[in-house]
Amino acid sequence: MHSPEISKSGFTLVELLVVISIIGVLVGLLLPGVLAARESARRMDCNNRMKQLGLAMANYESAFRRLPTLRLGSTNPSDPYARIGGLVMILPFLEQQPLFEKMQSSIQVGHFSASSNNEGSLSNSSMFCPLPGTTGDNGIIQPWLDKLTLFRCPSDPKQESAEEMGYTNYAFCVADTIVDNASGSTRGMFETKSFRRIAEATDGLSMTIFMSEIKVDGKMIEWLVDAELSTPCKSSSKRNCGFSVSPASPPTPPEFFGRGRRWVDGAPVFTSFNTILPPGDVSANHRNVSDLAYGNFTAGSFHASEGVNCVFGDGSVRFISSSIDCGDLTKPAPSGRDNSHSPYGAWGGLGTINSGEIVDANSL
């Protein structure tokens, strides 16, 4: 007499290992696609945010007949910092009127517009304010700590701490001007204490960059003297990025000096960029131990594809590859409002407003 056989259900060890292996292979095949889809969505979101910035500048220009200045502020000799940046000026056109009014109420101000004189210089349109982030007794002005999602690229992993001022991944173009781009004239659409007119962009709005992405980066920037900084290839040999007061004295809260680490601040290291070195390259500033130093500041992004989104004068947003033609980087940078051709190829030409370069749009 035979005992009835008892059937066993479930996987054997070998079968289980086979199933796990198959699942692992499927995950390996699908994960890159999922990650790519997420990055594509983030890049599209970034593109839309930049379109909003382009529209805000167009509406600002429609209201005041000029574009915002790179920075403006106090004319009080005891408080010489003109630090309010262009992003502050366009807040009302980004549906941020309450924040704009909060900033006005926190300090004694005039107004942010360029409506008072034909040349677009500061004149009576100045506002009186301390260095962003501090009051007269070195306290914090609360609105400077506000963070705006609109000014952050979704692909940037860095997040501000509560004690830091808000970051920005979007900056204004000062073209190929290096020396004194913090305080003097530039060959781009934006410069300090001057509200430029659309009509000045004789190269054509569709071929003139207004804004680009920048990387918020906390690494040390290289400090250079004039002779080194004036020739881009010399600064590009310095492989450190970011910004610091000095290698021996790193920044501490709340006055962080990192690239893009103050969206309210019009100093070049925070809210402007040059069209000299290709997107994603290094930045360098003048060795004057100040976060207001001029320098050669590059565009950059955290997108998987190498390059940056740029807002053009016609409101379009286009992706510029890091491999764009940058001309001859051994040549010194132009100065002032010189309207000669940029020595820095298509990238330099897209930043200038009236230098007469002919850039093939199909090459971008």
Residue ranges and their predicted role:
Residues 7-42, 46, 52:
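N-terminal single-pass transmembrane signal-anchor helix
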Residues 35-364:
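Internal low-complexity, small-residue/proline-rich segments
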